Amino acid sequence: MKVMECQTYEELSQIAARITADTIKEKPDAVLGLATGGTPEGTYRQLIRLHQTENLSFQNITTVNLDEYAGLSSDDPNSYHFYMNDRFFQHIDSKPSRHFIPNGNADDLEAECRRYEQLVDSLGDTDIQLLGIGRNGHIGFNEPGTSFKSRTHVVTLNEQTRQANARYFPSIDSVPKKALTMGIQTILSSKRILLLISGKSKAEAVRKLLEGNISEDFPASALHLHSDVTVLIDREAASLRP
């Protein structure tokens, strides 16, 4: 696990975008694993900038997203389908037919998880997977206690995760209680993982991660089992770093 400490969130975002861009330049038809939430937004802004100023092309890439809320249609402003289109896809030249996100509005969520896992597997190993981390160590929506052998599955979101995401919704009662997420084993199948951590609220999670103890009680600790993980942390997130 390689750890890079950045002075600011902006610097973190620039480095993450450059690493992702280099992956695309080396392999124009790369499979990118994408994340949502507040932390990756700066990376997406920087990738859009590279597209506009350096002619970085996304024309041949394929994207697979980590997760999606259950029960939200793709045009719901709080869905991750909407998030990805709004923050990234509509600003670049990628093909919509090559964007893959779990269908949280499927009639049979378990069947949708199996379909999505098979889809990700059929694309071959993801070339680079972007990740964020929750205060409780969750990656994707894999909450504490999730098996490291898990594949794409339906998860019941714990109260801490729902509270953290409530800022995007009218109220806590509007936050879905379930989601579909790639499993930890699915994530670990990626060739390279880029973990982005920003802000004082994540400092305790950084401390636990870098202590190196591997436990299903702290899902992100599974990343120690992967051979190519880069962790980008800003100064605030690094404030309790061991």
UniProtKB/Swiss-Prot annotation:
Enzyme Commission code: 3.5.99.6
GO-annotated biological processes: carbohydrate metabolic process; glucosamine catabolic process; N-acetylglucosamine catabolic process; N-acetylneuraminate catabolic process
GO annotation, cellular component aspect: cytoplasm
Biological function: Catalyzes the reversible isomerization-deamination of glucosamine 6-phosphate (GlcN6P) to form fructose 6-phosphate (Fru6P) and ammonium ion.
Protein name in UniProt: Glucosamine-6-phosphate deaminase 1
Catalytic activity as recorded in UniProt: alpha-D-glucosamine 6-phosphate + H2O = beta-D-fructose 6-phosphate + NH4(+)
Gene Ontology molecular-function annotations: glucosamine-6-phosphate deaminase activity; identical protein binding
Active site, UniProt feature: D67, N136, H138, E143
Organism, scientific name: Bacillus subtilis (strain 168)
Knockout-associated phenotype: Deletion of the gene has essentially no effect on growth on either glucosamine or N-acetylglucosamine. The gamA-nagB double mutant cannot grow on glucosamine or N-acetylglucosamine.
